[in-house]
Amino acid sequence: MDLPDVTAVQHESRQLALASSAAELHGGLCGWLSGGGADSADWLARILADSGQVAPRQGGALDQLRQATVAQLEDRDFAFELLLVEDGAPLPARTDALFDWCRAFLGGFGLAAQQRPALSEEGEEALQDLARLAQASSDDFDTADEDDTALAEIEEFVRVAVLLLHGDCVMGPRFRQRLN
């Protein structure tokens, strides 16, 4: 299932008077789900830690974002994608969106996992690496082609790290429960 268009997510986010970008919303949602948080229509209230937050309109871009994200995280073909910025955005905007995504992921993951979850050694490393990325900024990149390639590699690393953490916190326990 494909993610909704980033512009549609931004538009609906503005309609709900949210200060978060599409990248931050997706990062927070992915963190929430990867940390074992429930897939529910009121996901915004959960990741924003605001019980007064209205649930997204059913069938709207934010609801589609939740549904597609759940489907992608559960996909056995590892079809998970990051929702960052519009295609063709300048390198600084893309790097800032990725680092914002990582910060939001960590927040959502922490809210869902609450106490430190049992992670594999690789999961621990992935979480630490995501924390380092969350501290970075676009100032760490130039506009050179090498930086464009480096950003693509970092995006792929983040994608794999998220799948690994989701596997440790959600898929692994679910599989072990089925065995018992």
From Swiss-Prot:
Return the Pfam families for the record.
UPF0149
GO cellular component: a single term: cytosol
Q: Which domain of life is it from?
A: Bacteria
Q: Which InterPro entries match?
A: YgfB-like (IPR011978), YgfB-like_sf (IPR036255)
**Where are the membrane-spanning stretches?**
none
Family from the record: Belongs to the UPF0149 family.
| NCBIfam families (UniProt xref) | PRK04758.1
Question: What's the name of the protein?
Answer: UPF0149 protein XAC3406
